[in-house]
Each structure stands twice: as structure tokens, then as C-alpha cells.
From Swiss-Prot:
One of its GO terms (biological process) is regulation of DNA replication. The lineage of its organism: Archaea, Methanobacteriati, Methanobacteriota, Stenosarchaea group, Methanomicrobia. Signal peptide: none annotated. The keyword Glycoprotein does not apply. This is DNA polymerase sliding clamp. Belongs to the PCNA family. The gene is pcn. Homotrimer. The subunits circularize to form a toroid; DNA passes through its center. Replication factor C (RFC) is required to load the toroid on the DNA.
């Protein structure tokens, strides 16, 4: 059994954050909330999503796992206004998710979770540098880099965090000192990342006041931020692009 009611804009943002990684997911539903762990088909990006029961206006659930087509639910939520309430229900033993929004009632067929890629193991990484910055600053730097190159260098040098992109003839670089950041833990960090992934991953951060980046040298980057006034969290782990000498 699962019954819940949640703000439409919050649900849209949560689904959009997952959809940048995969099209289909296994939702783990528990009395304390919902969680998803998924990795993209190329094994380059991983998404970790948690939404506690306090993020919902109403929430009641037994432990279960369901498979969802994110494209279907994204299309369905497209008709909802930002202040609408989305009501969802799942009866025990049913493979249909009932959704009410904007005066419309939908019956959404669920996917068999066993046909969806299994939940990945989250690697334990020792990332020496940590940067906390405003989400809009991160998004701005990535958008600027897109116009120059297909990859971006991110690192920490002393008390400065930098993001840099180089093309054949052009270059863009953003430096932020300790006084321009929300927080900085200095450490040896310099890694190159694909903008094909970064561009989509940072889209949800535009509305976020604090984004935490954990970095190393030629290591994955962990991008972590809260949603739903702290009742939820989204984390991305993105593998670096290693260039041969």
C-alpha cells in the first residue's frame, strides 16, 4: 500500500533530476520515504535520490519496490500547475499507479522492477577537496563552458576553486576565492569532466542555495544538494574524463 500527496513543482523537479541519468528507475518505497539509486547505461554518472516522508503533504506506505518510466510521468506532470497537489495511490498487489492532478485522474502502468537495471553499489571515495557554492554560480560556469568546449576542468588550488574550459582557439575560466564561496576545504583536486553530462546534471541546482562539490585528482566528482527544505537530497557521482598523454 502506498498513498501520498505532494506539491507538483517539487515532484516535477525530483523526477527531472533523475531523468538526466536514466529513463527507467526502481523506486524503493518505505514508511520513512522514497529512495532511488541509478546509473546511466555508459556507467559514467550515478544518481542517488532520497525524499523523506516529511516532504509530502500526506504520506502512508508499506515497504515495496515499483518500476517507473520517467518519460511517462514527466509527460503526465506537464499538465500540472506549480501549485497543484499531486495525489498518488498504489493498492497492494496492483501494478497500476493512480495519480490525481489538476482535476484529472490517471492510471499509470508500472514496470516490472526485475526488468530494470539493479541498484548500483555506491563507491566509497576519499575526495580531499570540498567546495560549497551557490547553485546558480555552478550553472553559470557550466553554461559558459558549453560555448567553448565539450569538457570542463574543475579543481582547487590553494584557497581558490576554479572551473575552466578550453577550445581550439577560445578559453573561459571562473575562479572563486574562499570569500566568494559558502565553504571551502582545500585539498589537491583537478579533474576533467564531460559537459554532455555536467550540463544536464547541474540543471536542478539552479534553484538551490547550497551545492557541495567533493573533488580529487583524476577522481569522480560528487555533486550533492538538498531539496524540499532539507527533507530530500540529490547526489550525483560523475566519472572523470581521463586524457592520454
Amino acid at each position: 500500500m502506498f498513498k501520498a500527496a505532494i506539491n507538483a513543482e517539487l515532484l516535477k523537479d525530483a523526477i527531472a533530476a533523475l531523468a538526466v541519468i536514466v529513463d527507467e528507475v526502481r523506486f524503493k518505497i518505505k514508511p520513512e520515504g522514497i529512495s532511488v539509486k541509478a546509473v546511466d547505461p555508459a556507467n559514467v554518472a550515478m544518481g542517488i535520490f532520497e525524499l523523506g516522508s516529511s516532504a509530502f503533504d500526506e504520506y502512508s506506505a508499506d515497504e515495496c519496490e515499483i518500476g517507473l518510466d520517467l518519460n511517462k510521468i514527466t509527460d503526465l506532470l506537464g499538465i500540472a500547475d506549480r501549485n497543484d497537489t499531486v495525489r498518488m495511490g498504489l493498492e497492494e498487489g496492483s501494478n497500476k499507479l493512480l495519480i490525481d492532478v489538476g482535476g484529472l485522474s490517471y492510471t499509470l502502468s508500472l514496470l516490472d522492477p526485475s526488468t530494470i537495471r539493479a541498484e548500483p553499489r555506491v563507491p566509497q571515495l576519499e575526495l580531499p577537496a570540498k567546495v560549497v557554492l551557490n547553485g546558480a554560480d555552478l550553472r553559470r560556469a557550466v553554461k559558459a563552458a558549453e560555448k567553448i568546449s565539450d569538457h570542463m576542468l574543475m579543481g582547487v588550488s590553494g584557497d581558490t576553486f576554479y572551473m575552466e574550459a578550453k577550445g581550439d582557439t577560445d578559453q573561459v575560466r571562473l575562479e572563486m576565492g574562499r570569500d566568494q564561496l559558502i565553504d571551502l576545504k582545500a585539498g589537491e583536486a583537478c579533474s576533467l569532466f564531460s559537459l554532455d553530462y555536467l550540463t544536464d546534471i547541474v540543471k536542478p541546482t539552479n534553484k538551490v542555495n547550497e551545492v557541495t562539490l567533493s573533488l580529487g585528482r583524476d577522481f569522480p566528482i560528487l555533486i550533492d544538494f538538498e531539496i524540499a527544505n532539507g527533507a530530500g537530497r540529490i547526489s550525483y557521482l560523475l566519472a572523470p574524463r581521463i586524457e592520454s598523454d
